[in-house]
Every structure is written in C-alpha cells, then in structure tokens.
Amino acid sequence: MAIGKRLKKAREGVDREKLYPLADAIKMVKERAVSKFDETIEIAINLGVDPRHADQMVRGVVTLPNGTGRTLRVGVFARGAKADEARAAGADVVGAEDLVEKVQGGTIEFDRCIATPDMMPLVGRLGKVLGPRGMMPNPKIGTVTMDITNAVKGAKGGSVEFRVEKAGIVQAGIGKASFGEDKLVENIKALTDAVSKAKPAGAKGTYIQRVAVSSTMGPGVKVEPGSILG
C-alpha cells in the first residue's frame, strides 16, 4: 500500500479537532502503527514560550521509567581514569584529542555525547558540528559531569534530552509501538512532568498549550493536557 493511502486509512476514525484523554490517544496511535517495523511513538508539546528570549528557553533531561526502546550509542570525551570509567560503564566511543579529530573529520559514531569538565575547552571546538545536532555537552542537562558512570548508564538506560524548538515546541520519542499502553502512558507523564518542572521564569500565560501523540508513520492525535498533568 502506498504511503499516502496508508496514512489516509490510518487517519480514519481520528477527529483532528477533538482532544482525547491520554489513554485513548495512545490506544488510537498504537492501533494505527501498522508498518513492518516497530514504529517510534512520539509526542509534541506546544509551549507558551518564545525561545528567542534567553529567559524563556526550556531544556532538560529525564529518564523514562520504561526506557525508549532505542539503543543509543554514547560517546565520552575524557582522559585517564575517567576514560576507563566511561568504558566500564558501557560507553561506545571514548577519547580525547583523537576523538575530537574524528568528529572534526565528519565521523560521528555516537548519538549522545558526554564530557568531563576539563575536556570542554577541547570539545568547544566542535560546536559547529555537534551544536546543530543537539549533541553538544551541557552541564545543565548533566552531560558535562565528573559522574561519568551515572551519565553513561542514564543515557543507555532510557534518558531523553528535550529542548524547545524555535516554534515553541518540544518533541521527543517516548517508546515503541510494541510497548504496552500503560508503559507509554507512564513515559509520557514522566516527560511532561519534567517539561512542566523546567518552566522558565519568563514564561507567561498558559505554559503547556497543546499536546499531540503520533507514531512514525501515523497521524497525530491531540491529547487533553489535563489528562496528562492531572
């Protein structure tokens, strides 16, 4: 079936104007995730912020109670004992100057990046490469740290970084279509709670304005925010 026809069929039964309770929305999304691969379940949260203003930036990290269903490759910039600690914790790529050179050369063999504080002057050279990919280590989200073991295990165990985009939207994958409905609900509530707690001082009016969930190839289903936050 062509993608257009499949999406049209998947949209049947979804009222695009209605706000559904979270459990109902998840059920509908799962029922419409009919691709041959295990689709990612995604959430989009529209926030009442303007990220062009520094006091309205929203970002953070949260460990989902049921993981993401995705295997992340973790890269760590560290030397000596901290490099050994990273390897022992399960990091996929560990290095210092050598790793910086590889990244500068266009070879990025990781999905999440962690660094010890002493490495940041070196890692800072990679801003133009890692920044646009949302991979630049940042102490605010725990990816610049001396606690390498917990940072690596957190990244491997289902932690999700979130950051508001220019349009005021936070988007994240919160599991797979193969997950049980209850597990997806728990993950969404954990993420939304973290986003809520990250509300910036400069935010005015209604903070969480609209929420929608979808699968990789399926239609978006709007969610009643109160059914998540309540």
Curated annotation (Swiss-Prot):
One of its GO terms (molecular function) is rRNA binding. GO terms for cellular component: cytosolic large ribosomal subunit. InterPro entries: Ribosom_uL1_bac-type, Ribosomal_uL1, Ribosomal_uL1-like, Ribosomal_uL1/biogenesis, Ribosomal_uL1_3-a/b-sand, Ribosomal_uL1_CS. It comes from the Bacteria. GO terms for biological process: regulation of translation; translation. Keywords: Repressor, Ribonucleoprotein, Ribosomal protein, RNA-binding, rRNA-binding, Translation regulation, tRNA-binding. SUPFAM superfamilies: Ribosomal protein L1 (SSF56808). Transmembrane segments: none annotated. Belongs to the universal ribosomal protein uL1 family. Binds directly to 23S rRNA. The L1 stalk is quite mobile in the ribosome, and is involved in E site tRNA release. Protein L1 is also a translational repressor protein, it controls the translation of the L11 operon by binding to its mRNA. Part of the 50S ribosomal subunit. This is Large ribosomal subunit protein uL1. It comes from Rhodopseudomonas palustris (strain BisB18). The gene is rplA.
